């Protein structure tokens, strides 16, 4: 069985299209708004949504992602909450690759 990501790339390729891949930090600016943003990204045409896990020492990331990680962690975001966020998204959208 092909994954959602592979199916999306195959479909884009077969239609000679490029895809829109969006990124956000889980839990930023807070859990509820993050879920709203993910839903809107999907509705607005994002072909794939990358959700970054906030990390306390994101040295490989640029300043914007570092700051969003800090804010998410300062608000109490955890890895478990990231998985909860994705589960909530999946209850309404089973197709958009994450």
Regions found by a protein language model. Give the residues of each.
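Glycine-rich, proline-tolerant flexible connector loops at the mouths of alpha/beta enzymes
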Residues: 28-31, 44-77
């Amino acid at each position: 069985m092909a994954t959602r990501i592979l199916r999306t790339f195959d479909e884009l390729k077969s239609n000679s299209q490029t895809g829109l891949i969006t990124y956000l930090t889980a839990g930023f600016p807070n859990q509820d708004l993050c879920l709203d943003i993910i839903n809107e990204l999907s509705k607005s045409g994002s072909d794939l949504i990358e959700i970054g896990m906030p990390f306390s020492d994101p040295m490989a990331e640029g300043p914007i992602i570092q700051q969003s990680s800090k804010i998410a962690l300062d608000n109490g975001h955890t890895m478990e909450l990231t998985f909860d966020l994705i589960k909530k998204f999946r209850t309404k959208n089973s197709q958009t690759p994450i």
